[in-house]
């Protein structure tokens, strides 16, 4: 097959000007965030906080190194556009090889490294972003900033690995509940369980002077992280993972550091996953019962709830169920990149069980927001679930619900747990949970 390239000099000249402008925006963005991302300050004066800060600082330094390579590619690309069509084609081929080699070296470091780098890349473009304040649902909620060439450049760079960041990737590989790999993931066997498991990684809580206890509620295991000096405040933390993954190391880091820095006791329900027979019809009432038990024991003002992704689904569905049963609700709730409408994937059908996928127990986006506590919703513009957060915002406005939203530009799914920018928002979230001044 013969391929043809049609080169229009005037069009290429205009394109070169646009691309050069994009490069200027990206360069300015990278410079603007260099200090914040390469020298992340420790949240407290302790070894664990310093280690976490060093980890994210290393991520920022890696991104700056990659940005330098991309700048070389960009400069050559602009030169190629300015030249003749033949020169453009040759330069594009040469620079594509250069860019490919950079990503190839990352691939050689393993799947986990690639996943982390991809998750960090979009966040580094948010120049000047520190901490996004929430806005009430009654206000006009939009993602701060407007689409730009930098956004297109960023999204284009992520396109080859887009499936890794999408829930559809989980659907493709894990759609069948009896998949042997799903059984392995849920097996809680080391060393896999150190990264995806039903208990914190070894030594983490010992280093923080915390006590980890294992109890059960209605047949559901509950992990309790008690700090050295508890304040009497309790957080029910519901992990995400598309209803098929146990808590990750990022969840346990967040829960443990939160308990350490605030003195709140964190309770993590290990609810049955889809491959273990878990369905919305059984898990949501059990989750609501656990939260109600905590409220009965410690008082409404001392109990709050946080959930990310699928955990955000469970948190909202459980609160709606508590209202429907006439039970008190927690003092506040924080939803991080919540998956509120599970759609029609095979995983969704399995989670729904005998219920319709638009039943509020399955997809709480279709439930009532009346009677719910003050709720804070975090979402990012690059999150496939961001549209659901916008729909929730509109519903909250119509129903007059006490909801506030953080719609952050250039942020990915679960950015609060996975990126340096999320780390900056942890103190704000602790305040919203009522466990920090």
Swiss-Prot record:
Region (Lipase): 207-437
Keywords (A to Z) from UniProt: Cell wall, Cytoplasm, Hydrolase, Lipid degradation, Lipid metabolism, Secreted, Virulence
Cellular component terms (Gene Ontology): cell surface; cytoplasm; extracellular region
pH behavior: Optimum pH is between 8 and 9.
Region described as Linker: 101-206
Domain observations: Contains an N-terminal PE domain and a C-terminal catalytic domain, which are connected by a linker region. The PE domain is involved in aggregation and activity regulation. It is also required for ESX-5-dependent secretion. After transport, the PE domain is removed by proteolytic cleavage.
Protein name, entry field: Triacylglycerol lipase
Annotated gene: lipY
């Amino acid at each position: 097959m013969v391929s043809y390239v049609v080169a229009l000099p005037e069009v290429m000249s205009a394109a070169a000007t646009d691309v050069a402008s994009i490069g200027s925006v990206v360069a300015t963005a990278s410079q603007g965030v260099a200090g914040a991302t390469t020298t992340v300050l420790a949240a407290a004066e302790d070894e664990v906080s310093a280690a976490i800060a060093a980890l994210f600082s290393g991520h920022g330094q890696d991104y700056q190194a990659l940005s330098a390579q991309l700048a070389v590619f960009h400069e050559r690309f602009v030169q190629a556009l300015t030249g003749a069509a033949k020169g453009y084609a040759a330069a594009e081929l040469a620079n594509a090889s250069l860019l490919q080699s950079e990503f190839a070296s990352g691939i050689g470091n393993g799947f986990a490294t690639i996943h982390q780098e991809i998750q960090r890349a979009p966040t580094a473009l948010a120049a000047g972003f520190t901490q996004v304040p929430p806005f009430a649902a009654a206000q006009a909620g939009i993602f701060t900033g407007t689409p730009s060439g930098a956004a297109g450049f960023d999204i284009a760079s992520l396109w080859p690995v887009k499936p890794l960041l999408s829930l559809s990737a989980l659907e493709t590989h894990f759609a069948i509940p009896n998949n042997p790999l799903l059984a392995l993931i849920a097996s809680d066997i080391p060393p896999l369980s150190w990264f995806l498991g039903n208990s914190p990684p070894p030594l983490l809580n010992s280093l923080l002077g915390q006590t980890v206890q294992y109890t059960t509620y209605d047949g559901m295991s509950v992990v309790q992280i008690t700090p050295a000096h508890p304040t009497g405040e309790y957080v029910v933390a519901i992990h995400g993972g598309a209803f098929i993954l146990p808590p990750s190391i990022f969840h346990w880091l967040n829960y443990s550091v939160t308990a350490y820095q605030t003195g709140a006791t964190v309770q993590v329900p290990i609810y049955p996953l889809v491959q273990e027979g878990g369905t919305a019809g059984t898990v949501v009432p059990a989750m609501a019962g656990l939260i109600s038990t905590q409220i009965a024991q410690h008082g409404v003002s001392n109990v709050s709830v946080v959930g990310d992704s699928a955990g955000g689904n469970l948190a909202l569905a459980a609160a709606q169920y508590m209202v429907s049963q006439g039970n008190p609700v927690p003092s506040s709730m924080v939803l991080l990149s919540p998956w509120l409408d599970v759609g029609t994937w095979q995983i969704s059908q399995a989670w729904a069980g005998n219920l319709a996928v638009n039943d509020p127990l399955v997809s709480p986006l279709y439930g009532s927001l009346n009677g719910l506590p003050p709720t804070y919703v975090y979402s990012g513009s690059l999150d496939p679930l961001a549209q659901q957060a916008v729909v929730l915002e509109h519903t909250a406005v119509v129903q007059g619900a006490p909801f506030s939203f953080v719609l952050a530009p250039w942020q990915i799914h679960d950015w609060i747990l996975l990126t340096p920018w999320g780390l900056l928002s942890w103190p704000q979230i602790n305040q919203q949970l009522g466990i920090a001044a």
